[in-house]
Amino acid sequence: MARIAGIDIPREKRVEVALTYIYGVGLTRAKSILAKAGVNPDIRVKDLDDGDVQKLRTAVESFTLEGDLRRQEGMALKRLQDIGCLRGRRHRMSLPVRGQRTRTNARTRRGSRKTVAGRKK
């Protein structure tokens, strides 16, 4: 396995797909990394030589990925919560943030239903 950005990427997959195992790298970014490094996207990871792997490492270093990206996203959410804006409050209450309805639906975000005892007649 080639190790890029602290992640062991799978040997049997095409390089283009294998790069998406890195947090913060999707298919589009993987294609741009391969173009920047000058590596053919159709070859398998096991067929890469050391020079190609080194080129990929240097190309990947120019992006914010993995732990740094997770930390950056967490700090952005914490900032929203600290300033007390609506988005931050919705995140804190585990409710949908982008204006979706919550009277019905939003079950994934709100969690499982809380059982309410039925009234006796």
From Swiss-Prot:
It holds the Pfam family Ribosomal_S13. GO terms for cellular component: cytosol; small ribosomal subunit. Belongs to the universal ribosomal protein uS13 family. The gene is rpsM. Located at the top of the head of the 30S subunit, it contacts several helices of the 16S rRNA. In the 70S ribosome it contacts the 23S rRNA (bridge B1a) and protein L5 of the 50S subunit (bridge B1b), connecting the 2 subunits; these bridges are implicated in subunit movement. Contacts the tRNAs in the A and P-sites. The keyword Calcium does not apply. One of its GO terms (molecular function) is structural constituent of ribosome. Part of the 30S ribosomal subunit. Forms a loose heterodimer with protein S19. Forms two bridges to the 50S subunit in the 70S ribosome. One of its GO terms (biological process) is translation. NCBIfam families: uS13_bact. Residues 91-121 are annotated as: Disordered. The keyword S-adenosyl-L-methionine does not apply. It comes from the Bacteria. This is Small ribosomal subunit protein uS13. InterPro entries: Rbsml_uS13_C (IPR027437), Ribosomal_uS13 (IPR001892), Ribosomal_uS13-like_H2TH (IPR010979), Ribosomal_uS13_bac-type (IPR019980), Ribosomal_uS13_CS (IPR018269). Keywords: Ribonucleoprotein, Ribosomal protein, RNA-binding, rRNA-binding, tRNA-binding. The lineage of its organism: Bacteria, Bacillati, Cyanobacteriota, Cyanophyceae, Synechococcales. Residues 100-121 have a biased composition (Basic residues).
